[in-house]
Amino acid sequence: YRGCRWNGRTNSLGLNNSRVEKMRSKDSFVLPRTGTVLKNRTVLAAMTNKQSYENGILSEEEKKWLIRRAKGDFAITTTAATNVTETGRGWNGEMGVWGDHHIPGLTDLATGLRQSGTISLAQLFHGGMRAPKSINGVQPVSASINTEPGMDGIYTKALEHNEIKEMINSFADAAVRCEESGFDGVELHGAHSYLICQFLGKITNRRDDEWGGNLEGRSKFLREIIKLIRERTNPNFLIAVRISPIIEKAGIFLEDSLELAKILSKLEIDMLHISCWDVFQKIESDSQNRSLTKLFRGVIPDSLPLISTGAVWTAKD
């Protein structure tokens, strides 16, 4: 799986196992659902740089930082995590997409990225149990009552049904703002134990209603976000979904993640992004000694491109 290096966090787009070996990182790539042409198969993943103002507005430094990296010839450039609500920030200096006052800065960034020749994705995010009260001034929320190291011993409030619906709307509102600003699409951050991930995990989601229980219930939050974004944006607006294959402390295990990939492949998304940390690492429990990347590629159809992250340092990789 080929890619290009950037600050240790790089990605490559894959097809199926047989065709990937015949492609090079510099080869162009067509996203099947929309026909969007990517100039090559490299993707710059979201990286946290903490340069936005307290109100979530982009600073000039942050715009320049990302545009400069986009000029490294990446086919897709992803922003840092952008928060969909004012009280879901995971850290200081985080980009915001929760209000219309963010649109001018987002427009400047999207324009600069387009002029750099890259496809732009804004990564949509909510910290959930990883949104400290010390930053947001309110009790954090999650799928269930949870806590997290670094949260000063504060437990989350489990979201009520109407609050879940409001949160889904917040993600969709943010996607609409990104489209209005000129972004080519969004990436839903369902990895790394943030809010979407908290709904997916068996340990972080202990609900017994329609938003919990089996994988169908635990994935409903993510699926409803995808459906509403698709309803409210242009058909050619791109949606990528990022997930973590394994986070044992959250109750996310490989078997469920592979099944989730199958579920997501039936929705109108354009890319599945797995955060592997090392795309070459083999899975000990796999009888064929395959990597996570190959395992996921093997369970989703060719019509859904796969982005895999981690330890891609050179074109040879």
Regions found by a protein language model. Name each.
Residues G3-D317:
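Flavin-dependent oxidoreductase catalytic cores
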